[in-house]
């Protein structure tokens, strides 16, 4: 598979392991229009890649993914019709990630927030640096976590804990995330690369079909959940994109102040 047409994502191979790296390090790998479009097709291309059996997803630089790019958020406020296209791409991202038959390991090298957290949590195995934090602060910018977070968090940690984090937008340490079952494993930054390589190579050397079919089977309930409810979640997020509270949150972020929400 040729991945040369990607601009915001880098690729490299180690044997039968394909590494996918979000590559906007100066913006903490925040998702802009270009990266969002590439994410909507990268897992389809990874599935089609005949030279790999395991995929590793990570971020370039100090962060894994800081969620939505603030300039892109402003663009969606200014032209809300564009958010409808974004919503369709969001659906492609989630379902292509769930449809990927190859084991997908997240190397959580740094903070993962919002969409970044959803990208991580929809992976099969999540190995994190103990310096990383994870959370879904959609509500902090006046948005609904309808593009994945509202569905995957309760499946991993239960509704009581999920609602606390989704309603407050609070970030948690990787150590706490491992403790409550949100992620798989936490290691020091010095051994993160080696640990992920060890896991990826072990899985890649296993019974490929049995492993893939085990993943497919395990993902069936998740896929059923997303197929049943994702359209509603993303519709609510589209509605929240048009609210005064969202516009205020983005304006406040740009002005480096705390937003004043009015419930509108």
Segments from the language model and where they lie:
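Conserved CoA-thioester-binding segment of acyl-CoA-metabolizing enzymes
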Residues: 1-60, 95
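Terminal peptide-recognition signature
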Residues: 20, 24, 39, 57, ...
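Short beta-strand->loop
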Residues: 225-230, 263
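Crotonase-fold acyl-CoA enzyme core
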Residues: 3, 95-209, 235-238, 242-243, ...
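Glycine- (often His-adjacent) and acidic-residue-rich active-site loop
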Residues: 3, 59-96, 112, 142, ...
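A short, glycine- and basic residue-enriched loop/turn
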Residues: 25-28, 61-62, 67-70, 111, ...
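Hydrophobic alpha-helical membrane-association signature
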Residues: 35-38, 86-89, 192, 233
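Short, charged, surface-exposed hinge/linker loops at domain edges
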Residues: 215-224
């Amino acid at each position: 598979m040729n991945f040369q047409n990607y601009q915001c994502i880098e690729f490299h191979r180690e044997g039968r392991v394909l590494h996918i790296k979000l590559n906007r390090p100066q913006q903490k790998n925040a998702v802009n229009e270009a990266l969002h479009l590439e994410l909507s097709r990268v897992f389809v291309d990874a599935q089609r890649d005949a030279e790999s059996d395991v995929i590793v997803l990570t971020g370039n630089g100090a962060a894994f993914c800081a969620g939505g790019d603030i300039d892109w958020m402003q663009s969606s406020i200014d032209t809300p019709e564009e958010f409808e296209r974004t919503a369709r791409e969001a659906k492609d991202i989630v379902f292509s990630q769930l449809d990927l038959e190859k084991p997908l390991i997240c190397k959580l090298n740094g903070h993962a927030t919002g969409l970044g957290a959803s990208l991580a949590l929809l992976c099969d195995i999540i190995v994190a640096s103990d310096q990383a934090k994870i959370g879904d602060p959609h509500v902090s910018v006046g948005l609904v976590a309808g593009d994945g977070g509202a569905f995957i968090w309760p499946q991993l940690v239960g509704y009581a804990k999920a609602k606390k984090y989704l309603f407050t937008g609070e970030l948690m340490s990787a150590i706490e995330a491992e403790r409550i079952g949100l992620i798989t494993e936490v290691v020091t930054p010095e051994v993160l690369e080696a640990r992920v390589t060890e896991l990826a190579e072990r899985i890649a050397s296993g019974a490929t079909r049995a492993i893939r079919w085990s993943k497919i089977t395990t993902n069936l309930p998740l896929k059923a959940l997303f197929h049943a409810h994702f359209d509603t979640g993303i519709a609510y997020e589209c509605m929240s994109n048009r609210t005064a509270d969202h516009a205020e949150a983005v304006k406040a972020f740009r002005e480096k102040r705390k937003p004043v929400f009015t419930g509108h």
